Amino acid sequence: MASESDTEEFYDAPEDVHLGGGYPVGSPGKVGLSTFKETENTAYKVGNESPVQELKQDVSKKIIESIIEESQKVLQLEDDSLDSKGKELSDQATASPIVARTDLSNIPGLLAIDQVLPEESQKAESQNTFEETELELKKCFPSDETCEKPVDETTKLTQTSSTEQLNVLETETEVLNKEAVEVKGGGDVLEPVSSDSLSTKDFAAVEEVAPAKPPRHLTPEPDIVASTKKPVPARPPPPTNFPPPRPPPPSRPAPPPRKRKSELEFETLKTPDIDVPKENITSDSLLTASMASESTVKDSQPSLDLASATSGDKIVTAQENGKAPDGQTVAGEVMGPQRPRSNSGRELTDEEILASVMIKNLDTGEEIPLSLAEEKLPTGINPLTLHIMRRTKEYVSNDAAQSDDEEKLQSQPTDTDGGRLKQKTTQLKKFLGKSVKRAKHLAEEYGERAINKVKSVRDEVFHTDQDDPSSSDDEGMPYTRPVKFKAAHGFKGPYDFDQIKVVQDLSGEHMGAVWTMKFSHCGRLLASAGQDNVVRIWALKNAFDYFNNMRMKYNTEGRVSPSPSQESLSSSKSDTDTGVCSGTDEDPDDKNAPFRQRPFCKYKGHTADLLDLSWSKNYFLLSSSMDKTVRLWHISRRECLCCFQHIDFVTAIAFHPRDDRYFLSGSLDGKLRLWNIPDKKVALWNEVDGQTKLITAANFCQNGKYAVIGTYDGRCIFYDTEHLKYHTQIHVRSTRGRNKVGRKITGIEPLPGENKILVTSNDSRIRLYDLRDLSLSMKYKGYVNSSSQIKASFSHDFTYLVSGSEDKYVYIWSTYHDLSKFTSVRRDRNDFWEGIKAHNAVVTSAIFAPNPSLMLSLDVQSEKSEGNEKSEDAEVLDATPSGIMKTDNTEVLLSADFTGAIKVFVNKRKNVS
């Protein structure tokens, strides 16, 4: 029959609603037949078979009666009214099954409302894809038939009958589908999704055969559910917007796989337990211990190169997570300190400012104005210490710093009678007085030389140098002259450094104190820096040509870093021009001098004192300063490659020992930062806890596994380098006495072979800690370090350690006791030092050369070339192949002082059988 075929054809749309394609022009009647049957069967399976059949018969009778009664009225209506009537009946039937049964007889009333429905359906199209496509299907199918066929009574009655039957059956089917979903346990929120999944299964066959058609309006589904479950119809609107279109469900789980894929890419670059933000991880991420074997295969030696060092920004700010830490402005934007003002607004004078600052002596508890503390402060104090003193309002007197040494000296006369000691002292003074008088008499005959000799004897007795012009004495003497030597009381020898000699004096270049010196890894270059804001590079004579060729190679190729600073270009050009000269212009008398007398190059750019230096394995150099910046240099370039800005003074820096694309910086702002040089950013950072957050030292240990920092209050804090998380800490202090309060940490040096670290502090102590249990392995005493940034370091074979001192001596200890020299000694205490006196000011830095054979070969070969007299050293050279001398018993030592003098020592120990 025509009505049945029309109903079957129109019923194709509800099942095809989920296909989402464009609808065809032709009639999908064949497909609609199978679809209607599937929907009907699905509804019957739920268990409501009988009520549906009865509902069909009742509704059909009422439809026929209403059609006969109103047939004349229907003929007078417009075609579009008939078209919209089907939609009104569908909405009425969906809203309430009772209305669908009783109100169908009132067709004229329904037709009056049909004019509003198309506009409302158009609004629904923009809200939901399902609603839009279903509405289009309901509009188009009846209107197409109406336009193509002539309008007659029979056709319109048939269309009305089929449309009404369709709406009723559609409502019944949707109710049954919803009930089936409810039986399966869906809640209010999950019902729309369950209905979607159910329709997907029911119409699988249609999706395979039928062409793609637009989905239809699904607004009736939530309304029916709401009307059957709750009498209040206020809830249905939210569910109407809740169910998402069918296409999104497959796309909703799609994003998680993409995220997991990106995370897996990052996981391949780090260990699984690293908890680092993804923005901090790059393709060239920091090597970890677990990645060592894999990275060795891919990139045997990850290192920094000039291309990556010069790429990107020239000035990098210390921004963590995209913003300046703690909301502070970056260093380049920080305004200079404002001069304090009085209550009336007048600027205070320098005297008023100094008088207003009260500082406290930590040893005595005395508080004095800063203006009166100058005479009580230790001589040679550095500007960093003064800055910390102003911030902490604390200081340590020079006498208190030597308190333990005084106790040691006071313990000496306890073994002897006080009267006898006084008597010996008086006799010594009388003897010295006679010696001085005799020297005056000899001066008339032999001149000033005898006086200087007597003065040197006096200084050796008293270990003092008041008004002693020893520097002028040294200038007129050969560099092979032995220096003053002293040893600890009770240390009777044999000594290892009593025959040490000065072989070169590099004074006259630095204008002011030298705060730090560092050798390159190969031992051929020495970097020194300090108070004059300039970094100087000293090259060995036998390595000058190599580095000069390297520099000329880059200059001739025109490989200049982009936008170098003008002050760096101008200054370095003049400096390097004077330094670029042949190695034959040196003084022929300085045959034993290992370094060229003038610096290989000078790097200018810092605007305040330099505090620390660090070399990479391929000749990159980092310098940190009190101007709150870290600058990157390379030995082949004249200009600064990059500038890393900080918030406060940068007290310590260190290249990562295994991957020099990263470096560590410690600052007085309390933050430890791990910088990525190629990416020009802070890769990781952490902040020190506690009241005093001043970081005064930093380094790596265990071959880069841990980063260690030292603080002003005497703590050594360890961080896991992989993600810079806190690991453990050591409180560096004595158990009793004056040093039970932690003092400033000035240096941290690893002892690679034995898993230990060497810690220098301002309590005039050097401590060796075992990292396996954080126990104290050895404590070294004897030197004076109460307020300086003096730090101790190891010799090339870790047999000795050396440190400068505020008493103008260089102190050397054996790392471990030679038990053959002592009958009874504490294994965890080392008071047996050897001292060298070669400076007339505070020795601010002292280091061993990492490769002394490079320097000794020059010395020995020059002696061999003379051929006049063969020394024992030359005989040793003959016994060794390729002209390289054995260095097992030889050390090269360098020291710098508060006046800028740098001296080079060579020590050749006696052969021990």
Swiss-Prot record:
Residue stretches in coiled coil: 119-184
Record-level Gene Ontology MF annotations: molecular sequestering activity; small GTPase binding
Record's compositionally biased regions (Basic and acidic residues): 262-278
Residues recorded as bearing Phosphothreonine in the entry: T158, T219, T271, T349
Intracellular or extracellular location(s): Cytoplasm, Cytosol; Cytoplasm, Perinuclear region; Endosome membrane; Golgi apparatus, trans-Golgi network
GO cellular component: cytosol; endosome membrane; Golgi apparatus; perinuclear region of cytoplasm
Motif mapping: FFAT-like motif: 9-15
Compositionally biased tracts (Acidic residues): 1-14, 467-476
Biased composition (Pro residues): 233-256
Biased composition annotated in UniProt, kind: Polar residues: 280-311
Record region (Binding activity): 2-170
Entry text on domains: The FFAT-like motif is important for interaction with VAPA or VAPB.
Function: Downstream effector for Rab11 which regulates Rab11 intracellular membrane trafficking functions such as endocytic recycling, intracellular ciliogenesis and protein export. ATK1-mediated phosphorylation of WDR44 induces binding to Rab11 which activates endocytic recycling of transferrin receptor back to the plasma membrane. When bound to Rab11, prevents the formation of the ciliogenic Rab11-Rabin8/RAB3IP-RAB11FIP3 complex, therefore inhibiting preciliary trafficking and ciliogenesis.
Assembly behavior: Interacts with the GTP-bound form of RAB11A and RAB11B. Interacts with GRAF1/ARHGAP26 or GRAF2/ARHGAP10; the interaction connects the endoplasmic reticulum (ER) with the endosomal tubule. Interacts (via FFAT-like motif) with VAPA (via MSP domain) or VAPB (via MSP domain); the interaction connects the ER with the endosomal tubule. Does not bind to RAB7, RAB10, RAB14, RAB35 and RAB8A.
Record's protein name: WD repeat-containing protein 44
Gene name of this polypeptide: WDR44
